[in-house]
Amino acid sequence: MSIPKISQVKDLTRIERIGAHSHIRGLGIDDSLEPREISQGMVGQVGARKAAGLILQMIKEGKIAGRAILIGGEPGTGKTAIAMGMAQSLGEKTPFTAIAASEIFSLEMSKTEALTQAFRRSIGVRIKEETEVICGEVVDIQIDRPATGSGAKVGKLTLKTTSMDALYDLGAKMIDSLTKEKVQNGDIIRIDKGTGKITKLGRSLSRVRDHEISGSKVNFIECPEGEIQQRRTETHTVSLHEIDVINSRAQGFFALFAGDIGEIKSEVREQINQKVAEWKEEGKAEIVPGVLFIDEVHMLDIECFSYLNRALEDDMSPILIIATNRGNTTIRGTDYKAPHGIPLDLLDRLLIINTQPYTEKDIYKILKIRCEEEDVDIQEDALQLLTKIGVETSLRYAIHLITSSSLVSVKRKGTDVSVDDIKKVYDLFVDVKRSTKYLKDYQDEYLYNSQPETTATKTNEEQQTMQTA
């Protein structure tokens, strides 16, 4: 007699992608715009967070539009983190677009077109629409199917509220929709008369004691009051860019999903602006100025900066937040130097927020938050060592060592990350300073190693040539 084998079932762990700023939930400020020491994933940068909170409050109140804010500071001081915190605090109702400055350089469209699309993605249009809906509890559904199976299906639907009940005749499409949504007696549904869309709101409270199997996600609600047929105002928020795409191509709405948008004619945008202005005057729509965040803004050239000067003066312009880690450097496309690599006429239009380098205490707290975010158990002395590494090298390098040291700990079947695990990955992966030192020590062994000629060297060579002549 053969013994049946029991197969072992492995647990499938859920894969979660953890980004560099996935631990940030907001700016971490209270109602009086005072930054908390540790809140919503944000640590330190008290002055910068307070300034960003003030800007955030003005954005929410709609008091400023067409303003630009520059976040400047050294690499690894949390510039992008502050922008992401602002995006999280604004919520989903306010459009937020984040791009890198190098994204606008493309062979398929011009630089100004890419910037225009980014600007219009950041401007929302909140459209109000009145619709007639039928809302009530399903009392009975009767569907008559033809015996031959070839004719059209007909049926009747009985709905009720606390005040009245009504009987509706059903066509074939409505019967299919009810079947698709698995509507049954006791469900509370809402039907949009214009589109025929059926929405299940939940189950009636009168059916709680019924002997039926219901899942944990079933929502029991009271029977609706008043009339079955009602008028309700629905609000839809779309960006100006989405309206541009729908009106710019023959395929219309499907161009949103195709991805191949290309350049949009200025005439189309002008017509859309006029239409939106009409809706605004009639009270059908309102403009929602959002936020456009451009990281590494020093990568833009002089033509892009000239476009930004003009775009910020437009009536429908979002809040522009730009970030850079450069000091006095050359403006791209010119031979002139300027602070942050930005022309002085644009700098004059900016509100500038400076970020300060993190202290050792701040780095310790940030690394602790990142360990919790990545579900890594780490010993206290190992965390102290990681903090010391972060102070001597960079915060990003220390954060990268968290995951790699966790993998080393798992391989040795440890429960948490120890000092030895940190030392092992520190030896395996070098930081920028050690890599630079290695290159200097062994530069003769590398191919094409040469020192760039300086102006002084060239001048000395020219003088020697003249003396020889």
Curated annotation (Swiss-Prot):
GO terms for biological process: box C/D snoRNP assembly; chromatin remodeling; DNA recombination; DNA repair; regulation of transcription by RNA polymerase II. It comes from the Eukaryota. Pfam families: TIP49, TIP49_C. ATP binds at residues 73-80. It catalyses: ATP + H2O = ADP + phosphate + H(+). Its EC number is 3.6.4.12. Its main location: nucleus. Transmembrane segments: none annotated. GO terms for cellular component: Ino80 complex; NuA4 histone acetyltransferase complex; R2TP complex; Swr1 complex. The keyword DNA damage applies. Keywords: ATP-binding, DNA damage, DNA recombination, DNA repair, Helicase, Hydrolase, Nucleotide-binding, Nucleus, Transcription, Transcription regulation. It is found in: Nucleus. It is an enzyme of class 3 (hydrolase). Forms homohexameric rings. May form a dodecamer with rvb1 made of two stacked hexameric rings. Component of the chromatin remodeling Ino80 complex. Component of the RNA polymerase II holoenzyme complex. This is RuvB-like helicase 2. It comes from Dictyostelium discoideum (Social amoeba).
